[in-house]
Regions:
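Aromatic-rich, lipid-facing transmembrane alpha helices and their immediate juxtamembrane interface loops
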Residues: 2-279
Length: 279
């Protein structure tokens, strides 16, 4: 009987979460042409005032990581490709659809001053983001596994931290139901973490993930800070002020931290599934 309930919940949680997001999509009106292009910058760097800015934000961080992926003899990221590539593209497809939808309804958008060209309604750099950014974080994930295999602190706190985050994500969604970005992102993050916490017993990677998420905040703050206008006349990524929490860390909406948690946790979870399957 208990096993039947477990199987039932295993399917109910993702289905219920998807239904919640679809219900929100159908019932919530998003005000169009309401994107905020004026964000107080902390400083101004004239080099960033170029249509290639978003491209440069991919190129300069990713080239060294791509190089180390093939030539670092200890990390050897290329040996994980059979598990990494399916994880990257499966989750990228989900987020491409999500990103395109949010752009089309006016939850966020992209400033044409800072990207090269579009495919559909997304800049080419945005399409690439869902591959290059998780790949870069995976490089850190793998490097920490190799060079710092003992992860005592995060492994010790991962269960209470996971439970606290699950409650926090769903609470944020509940109390901000009228904000599309906040509500749907928090539902997604809470649901994927809850599902993994309850049912994925074979690949308990949460401690290692929390560690790399903490380390990854440094490059995230740099790149996302630039994308959200910390050093430019206008942001690269512009948001509808009625659809997010309205709280920013410098220029970065707090919702972005939840969004990136959902993206990176999902990629890592699927990567660990494929790695476990191939082993």
């Amino acid at each position: 009987m208990l096993e039947q309930r477990t199987v039932f919940l295993k399917y109910v949680i993702p289905i219920f979460s998807l239904v919640l997001i679809l219900v929100h999509w159908q019932t919530h009106f998003v005000k169009h042409n309401n994107l905020l292009f004026e964000v107080p910058a902390l400083w101004h760097i004239s080099f960033f005032e170029t249509k290639n800015l978003y491209f440069y934000l991919h190129l300069f961080p990713f080239i060294p990581i791509l190089t180390f992926s093939f030539f670092d003899k200890k990390v050897l990221i290329y040996k994980t490709f059979k598990a990494l590539f399916p994880a990257l593209f499966i989750i990228a497809i989900v987020f491409w659809v999500w990103d395109s939808w949010k752009t089309s309804v006016g939850v966020w958008g992209f400033n044409e001053r800072y990207y090269t060209f579009k495919i559909g309604n997304l800049p080419i750099e945005e399409w690439a983001f869902f591959i290059t950014f998780p790949w870069a974080i995976h490089f850190f994930y793998r490097s920490l596994e190799v060079f710092l295999p003992k992860n005592t602190f995060f492994n010790r706190i991962e269960r209470p931290l996971s439970m606290a985050l699950i409650i926090l994500f769903f609470a944020i969604a509940f109390f901000n139901w009228g904000k599309t970005y906040t509500a749907t992102t928090s539902i997604a993050a809470g649901s994927v973490l809850l599902w993994q916490f309850l049912f994925d017993k074979k690949t308990n990677f949460r401690g290692n993930f929390y560690r790399v998420y903490a380390v990854g905040l440094i490059p995230f703050l740099l790149t996302n800070g630039i994308l959200t206008g910390i050093a430019t006349e206008q942001p690269v990524v512009v948001y509808n002020p009625e659809e997010y929490l309205g709280i920013r860390f410098f220029t970065i909406p707090l919702d972005d931290f939840i969004y990136n948690f959902a993206l990176l946790f999902s990629v890592t979870m699927v990567y660990e599934w494929f790695r476990d399957f191939r082993n």
